[in-house]
UniProtKB/Swiss-Prot annotation:
Disordered: annotated segments: 1-54
One of the Pfam families matching this protein, by short name: Ribosomal_L27
GO cellular component: cytosolic large ribosomal subunit
Example of a GO MF term: structural constituent of ribosome
SUPFAM superfamilies: Ribosomal L27 protein-like (SSF110324)
Protein source organism: Chlamydia caviae (strain ATCC VR-813 / DSM 19441 / 03DC25 / GPIC) (Chlamydophila caviae)
PANTHER family: LARGE RIBOSOMAL SUBUNIT PROTEIN BL27M (PTHR15893:SF0), RIBOSOMAL PROTEIN L27 (PTHR15893)
Protein name per Swiss-Prot or TrEMBL: Large ribosomal subunit protein bL27
Keywords for this protein: Ribonucleoprotein, Ribosomal protein
Annotated signal sequence range: none
Family annotation (InterPro entries): Ribosomal_bL27 (IPR001684)
Similarity comment: family membership: Belongs to the bacterial ribosomal protein bL27 family.
GO biological process, one term: translation
Length: 82
């Protein structure tokens, strides 16, 4: 056992708080207007029909309905009204 901490040991031990990004609702789930569908940095998922995009690229539902994802060259998320 070392009787001294060693160089740099006192400078370690930090980590950033997780930002809880990602899909908040899965495909096929029912959502209400204003529900957050995805939290993201940049546009990993793109808004399609009845989906809005916030300043921080958050996707949210513009109508009540069911979430649908579609993957082509990009992944699109839409909400089909009920």
């Amino acid at each position: 056992m070392a009787h001294k901490k060693g160089q740099g040991a006192s400078r370690n031990g930090r980590d950033s708080e997780s930002k809880r990004l990602g899909m908040k609702v899965g495909a096929g789930q029912r959502v209400s207007t204003g529900s957050i569908l995805v939290r993201q940095r940049g546009t990993k998922w793109h808004p399609s029909q009845n989906v809005g995009r916030g300043r921080d690229d958050t996707l949210f539902a513009l109508v009540d309905g069911i979430v649908v994802t579609k993957k082509t060259d990009r992944t699109y998320i839409s909400v089909l009204p009920e």
